[in-house]
Regions:
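N-terminal nicking endonuclease/strand-transfer module with a His-rich metal-binding environment
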Residues: 1-135, 139
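Hydrophobic alpha-helical segments, chiefly the membrane-spanning helices
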Residues: 143-145
Protein backbone atom coordinates (compact mmCIF):
# COMPACT_ATOMS: atom_id res chain seq x y z
CA UNK A 1 0.00 0.00 0.00
CA UNK A 2 1.21 3.50 -0.75
CA UNK A 3 1.54 6.17 1.92
CA UNK A 4 -1.20 8.13 0.21
CA UNK A 5 -3.45 5.06 0.19
CA UNK A 6 -2.87 4.28 3.87
CA UNK A 7 -3.51 7.88 4.93
CA UNK A 8 -6.50 8.33 2.58
CA UNK A 9 -8.14 5.18 3.97
CA UNK A 10 -7.87 6.51 7.53
CA UNK A 11 -8.73 10.14 6.74
CA UNK A 12 -11.86 8.96 4.89
CA UNK A 13 -12.92 7.15 8.05
CA UNK A 14 -12.24 10.32 10.08
CA UNK A 15 -14.34 12.38 7.65
CA UNK A 16 -17.15 9.81 7.89
CA UNK A 17 -17.11 10.02 11.69
CA UNK A 18 -16.13 6.36 12.21
CA UNK A 19 -12.52 7.09 13.17
CA UNK A 20 -10.52 9.77 14.93
CA UNK A 21 -6.89 10.77 15.15
CA UNK A 22 -5.72 9.47 18.48
CA UNK A 23 -2.02 10.33 18.64
CA UNK A 24 1.12 10.82 16.66
CA UNK A 25 4.88 10.84 16.88
CA UNK A 26 7.12 13.31 15.05
CA UNK A 27 4.18 14.59 13.01
CA UNK A 28 3.20 18.12 12.03
CA UNK A 29 0.76 18.94 14.84
CA UNK A 30 -2.21 21.19 15.43
CA UNK A 31 -2.35 23.64 18.32
CA UNK A 32 -3.44 20.83 20.67
CA UNK A 33 -0.41 18.72 19.78
CA UNK A 34 -2.34 16.16 17.74
CA UNK A 35 -1.43 15.32 14.16
CA UNK A 36 -3.27 17.66 11.82
CA UNK A 37 -6.59 16.61 10.33
CA UNK A 38 -5.23 17.98 7.05
CA UNK A 39 -3.95 14.96 5.14
CA UNK A 40 -1.51 17.13 3.18
CA UNK A 41 0.31 17.98 6.41
CA UNK A 42 0.46 14.30 7.34
CA UNK A 43 2.01 13.53 3.95
CA UNK A 44 4.56 16.30 4.53
CA UNK A 45 5.48 14.76 7.89
CA UNK A 46 6.67 11.63 6.08
CA UNK A 47 8.10 13.24 2.94
CA UNK A 48 11.75 13.65 3.98
CA UNK A 49 11.90 10.03 5.13
CA UNK A 50 10.61 8.73 1.81
CA UNK A 51 12.83 11.04 -0.23
CA UNK A 52 15.91 9.88 1.70
CA UNK A 53 15.57 6.40 0.18
CA UNK A 54 13.56 5.80 -2.97
CA UNK A 55 14.92 2.27 -3.43
CA UNK A 56 13.05 0.59 -0.59
CA UNK A 57 10.38 -1.60 -2.12
CA UNK A 58 7.84 -1.33 0.71
CA UNK A 59 8.53 1.89 2.64
CA UNK A 60 5.07 2.18 4.24
CA UNK A 61 3.88 0.53 7.43
CA UNK A 62 0.12 0.19 8.06
CA UNK A 63 -0.67 -1.78 11.21
CA UNK A 64 -3.99 -2.63 12.81
CA UNK A 65 -4.16 -3.62 16.48
CA UNK A 66 -7.44 -4.91 17.84
CA UNK A 67 -7.76 -5.30 21.62
CA UNK A 68 -10.40 -7.67 22.95
CA UNK A 69 -13.81 -5.92 23.11
CA UNK A 70 -14.13 -6.60 26.82
CA UNK A 71 -10.91 -4.64 27.50
CA UNK A 72 -12.64 -1.30 26.82
CA UNK A 73 -9.40 0.69 26.67
CA UNK A 74 -9.52 4.47 27.04
CA UNK A 75 -8.12 6.67 24.30
CA UNK A 76 -5.05 7.26 26.46
CA UNK A 77 -4.45 3.54 26.88
CA UNK A 78 -4.93 2.93 23.14
CA UNK A 79 -2.38 5.65 22.36
CA UNK A 80 0.00 4.11 24.89
CA UNK A 81 -0.54 0.68 23.31
CA UNK A 82 0.43 2.11 19.90
CA UNK A 83 3.51 3.82 21.32
CA UNK A 84 4.74 0.71 23.15
CA UNK A 85 4.08 -1.48 20.13
CA UNK A 86 6.05 0.84 17.85
CA UNK A 87 8.93 0.94 20.34
CA UNK A 88 9.03 -2.86 20.60
CA UNK A 89 8.96 -3.27 16.82
CA UNK A 90 11.86 -0.83 16.32
CA UNK A 91 9.83 2.08 14.92
CA UNK A 92 9.63 4.22 18.06
CA UNK A 93 11.68 7.09 16.60
CA UNK A 94 9.75 7.16 13.34
CA UNK A 95 6.96 9.55 12.47
CA UNK A 96 3.64 7.77 12.86
CA UNK A 97 0.00 8.58 13.28
CA UNK A 98 -2.50 6.51 15.25
CA UNK A 99 -6.20 6.38 14.41
CA UNK A 100 -8.97 4.90 16.55
CA UNK A 101 -11.59 3.13 14.43
CA UNK A 102 -15.11 2.49 15.68
CA UNK A 103 -16.49 1.18 12.39
CA UNK A 104 -16.81 -2.46 13.52
CA UNK A 105 -18.14 -4.20 16.63
CA UNK A 106 -14.62 -3.96 18.06
CA UNK A 107 -12.87 -0.62 18.53
CA UNK A 108 -9.34 -0.93 17.13
CA UNK A 109 -6.40 1.23 16.12
CA UNK A 110 -4.51 1.73 12.88
CA UNK A 111 -0.94 3.01 12.82
CA UNK A 112 0.62 4.52 9.68
CA UNK A 113 4.38 5.02 9.47
CA UNK A 114 7.39 4.58 7.20
CA UNK A 115 10.17 1.96 7.30
CA UNK A 116 12.98 4.34 6.29
CA UNK A 117 14.78 6.49 8.86
CA UNK A 118 15.87 10.13 8.47
CA UNK A 119 19.20 9.11 6.94
CA UNK A 120 17.49 6.93 4.34
CA UNK A 121 18.36 3.64 5.99
CA UNK A 122 15.74 0.89 5.84
CA UNK A 123 14.72 -0.13 9.34
CA UNK A 124 15.29 -3.83 9.81
CA UNK A 125 12.12 -5.84 9.41
CA UNK A 126 13.67 -8.98 10.86
CA UNK A 127 11.58 -8.46 13.97
CA UNK A 128 8.44 -8.20 11.86
CA UNK A 129 9.17 -11.25 9.75
CA UNK A 130 9.57 -13.68 12.60
CA UNK A 131 6.19 -14.92 13.79
CA UNK A 132 7.71 -15.71 17.16
CA UNK A 133 8.98 -12.17 17.54
CA UNK A 134 5.88 -10.57 16.07
CA UNK A 135 3.71 -12.25 18.65
CA UNK A 136 6.01 -11.14 21.49
CA UNK A 137 5.13 -7.40 21.39
CA UNK A 138 1.49 -8.30 20.83
CA UNK A 139 1.50 -10.77 23.72
CA UNK A 140 3.28 -8.19 25.92
CA UNK A 141 0.65 -5.62 24.93
CA UNK A 142 -2.13 -8.08 25.76
CA UNK A 143 -0.64 -8.69 29.19
CA UNK A 144 -0.07 -4.98 29.80
CA UNK A 145 -3.51 -3.85 28.70
Amino acid sequence: MSLYGALAYNYEKVAAGTAEILSGNRMISDRLGLPSEDMRLALLSFENYLLANRNTEKPVLHISLSPAPEDRLTDGRLAELAERYMQKMGYGNQPYITYKHADTHNTHIHIVSVCVDEQGKKISDAYELSLIHISEPTRHAQISY
